[in-house]
From Swiss-Prot:
The gene is bssC. Heterohexamer composed of 2 alpha subunits, 2 beta subunits and 2 gamma subunits. Pathway: Xenobiotic degradation; toluene degradation. Its EC number is 4.1.99.11. Induction: Induced by toluene, probably via the TdiR/TdiS two-component regulatory system. It catalyses: toluene + fumarate = 2-benzylsuccinate. This is Benzylsuccinate synthase gamma subunit. Activated by the benzylsuccinate synthase activating enzyme BssD. Rapidly inactivated by oxygen.
Amino acid sequence: MTTCKDCAFFFSIPEDADDFEKSKGDCVTQKDDEKGRYWLSKPVFENDQCCGAFHKR
C-alpha cells in the first residue's frame, strides 16, 4: 500500500506554522486551464492512503 508520504505532491507542514500537526502535510497539484496555471492544495497526513494523483518521489 502506498501512502501520501511517498508521493511527490506531499509537502510537510513546518513546525512553526499555525496549522502544524505531527505527520500533517499538504497535497499540492498543478493544474492548467485556458486562463493559465494554478495549484490546488488539500490537507493530508503522511499515512493516508494515496489518491489517483499519486506520483512516486
